Amino acid sequence: SGFGKCSLTVALPILSAAGIETSALPTAILSTHTGGISGYTYRDLTEDMRPVMKHWKSLDIKFDAIYTGFLGSFEQFFDAFRQEDNLILVDPVMGDNGELYTVFTREFAAGMRMLCQKADIIVPNLTEAALLLDEPYHPGPYTHAYIESLLRKLGALGPQKVVLTGVYFKEDE
């Protein structure tokens, strides 16, 4: 996103401060983040990614980890750069507050579910969890039993670890 405190503008400084060397491959360009700002522009960069990936492969570049956020499509980046010992972390950015972002379709959510099967770690918010599981969104507050059920079902998709964001519990729990 060109404007807004999200995406690469937030992730890269944090990763750098942690001493992690990064290589960025933008998957899309948005004029602003999608949360609460209407009229944003969006361009999928999948076609632009292919020559970058081809060049990186020709250089025999290896990655210790692959971290995805907002994706325009499901280009097979993981398959091209997956190694036995690298970590795959997927933030399945698709929606918030019970709503799928307008640039995405339900079919996109199904594709994201398949991508999460290849991940070691997934980091969905509660909207994205509902979309990944093809279940209705529950706005909360949440019970421990409900969150544990979501975590089990998300784990059954295939990742080794699931970090669920946006969770808050009833005051009496």
Language model: regions and residue ranges:
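Conserved N-terminal subdomain of the carbohydrate kinase-like
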Residues: G2-T102
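Conserved phosphate/ATP/ADP-binding segment of small-molecule kinases
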Residues: T102-E173
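Fold-independent oxyanion-binding glycine-rich loops
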Residues: S1, T27, G69-L71, D91-V93, ...
